[in-house]
Amino acid sequence: MSLYFTTLFLLLTVEMVMLFIFVLPLPFRIRRGIFSTYNQLTAKQQIKTIIFITGCLVGLLFIDSWKRSQIRVSLYHNDNSGSIGSSAVTPIQALASRAYNQRNMYISGFILYFSICIPTVMSIVKRLVKYQGLINEQEKQKLNKPSSNSKKDSNEADSTKLQEELRKKQISLEGLQKQVKNLEKYFDEKNQPGNVAAAEASKKGN
């Protein structure tokens, strides 16, 4: 197994693992963390350059392997007549070379395919994270509304209690005012001149 084939197979495995993790139904926090890490990595110019160069090399390997796998294998036969007959066979080395090129073509093709699938899946994950964040904010607002309503109810209860106390104090104040008026009326009647003379005459008679 050559070095570049090992590298290609490792790259394909990494892409498959990444795509498998991205499509898993993960919790919101983990998915948001993965998306943030992916954005931070892909935003760097060095990472973009590495991805571009790797994509170009894999694309060239795919084209070369495809061309080599399409080459027709020459036929030969075992006799020395030099003519091609029904006993013609295909060389084992040519078949092995074709299989080797086809294998490289499939691996490089899948690498290119997954390199397109990963950004597409991440765009979907981006929308999922965005909408899930909006849903969570709406749920928090709904949870905060009852507390505000309870505060409003408590304020209304306090206001009602204060109004009731104020009404009672007004009633007691009105009662005191009536008592004061009655006392003033009583003293006014007692202090009139006729009433004073009658009171003095009754005292002298006694």
Curated annotation (Swiss-Prot):
Q: What is its main location?
A: endoplasmic reticulum
Q: Which GO terms describe its biological process?
A: endoplasmic reticulum to Golgi vesicle-mediated transport; intracellular protein transport; protein localization to endoplasmic reticulum exit site
What residue spans carry the region label Disordered? 140-163
Q: Where is this motif: Di-lysine motif?
A: 203-206
Q: Which regions of this chain are Cytoplasmic-facing, per the record's topological domains? A: 29-45, 126-206
Provide the domain comment: The di-lysine motif confers endoplasmic reticulum localization for type I membrane proteins.
Q: What is known about what this protein does? A: May play a role in anterograde transport of membrane proteins from the endoplasmic reticulum to the Golgi.
Q: What is this protein called?
A: Endoplasmic reticulum transmembrane protein 1
Q: Which organism is it from?
A: Saccharomyces cerevisiae (strain ATCC 204508 / S288c) (Baker's yeast)
The uppermost taxa in this organism's lineage are: Eukaryota, Fungi, Dikarya, Ascomycota, Saccharomycotina
